[in-house]
Amino acid sequence: MFKAQGFNVQYGSDICADRLNSIGDYILITHIEPWQFLKGKVKNQPLEVIEAKDLSKKYLDNLANRVPAVHIVGLGGGSAMDTAKWVHWRRQLPLTQIPSIPSVDACFTRMSALREEGGVKYEGDAVPELVIVDYELFRSAPAPMITSGIGDILSCHTAWFDWKYAHEQGRDEFGWKPSDPEISKTYLKELADCAPGIKAQTDDGLKRLMELHRDVGWRCHE
């Protein structure tokens, strides 16, 4: 069975409220839809709800400088995860990440994907106390936003061809080796095995997809 490495993670159904009710004062960085789904279940409401929308360095630094020194919670997709990571890192505040969809691995990576100069720049070094994976929260999202999570895993395989081509053209900065793609083959096998569960949105299928994301995130920072 595939064994992932990475951040501390808790899996379960309807577990978000328990975490939010137990962490004391916090700022919530989120998108509207997942918070609407969870808000009525949470007794310990956030001091402030901030909608994730701008990933420019200037905006994120200003945001980090103004929030109070309390627990930071990211709830949502990749932009919410990246915003929460930046605030946590800049201020060295405790961080909990709650992805609302399994479409990307942002909750398991340490850098934030900043939008600068018409492109993406990866900066920062965030390590959350805990990542909460709530199956009921996932199942509240549109089905395509759940199944699209296979794309990040598939890209781990297709990217090897770009790296090999760069090596053959004398433009490899990282030292391509023929043995390097073996891990992506492991990912593909696990993905093929759990694909029916992902489509059916079973607990097992969703957990195995997120464990793949977790391992990819860990390997980004080996």
Set out the residue ranges of the language-model regions.
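ATP/NTP phosphate-donor binding region
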Residues: 1-71
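Alpha-helical scaffold segments in soluble metabolic enzymes
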Residues: 18, 22, 62, 86, ...
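Short glycine/serine/threonine-rich phosphate/pyrophosphate-binding segments
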Residues: 35-37, 79-86, 104-107
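Active-site segments that bind and position negatively charged phosphate/pyrophosphate groups
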Residues: 176-222
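DPxDG-like acidic metal-binding loop motif
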Residues: 75, 82-93
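Glycine-rich beta-strand-to-loop/alpha-helix junction loops that act as flexible
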Residues: 31, 75-77, 214
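A glycine/threonine-rich phosphate-anchoring loop and its flanking beta-alpha core
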Residues: 89-187
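Residue-level detector of flexible, active-site-proximal loop/helix-junction positions
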Residues: 54-56, 79, 102
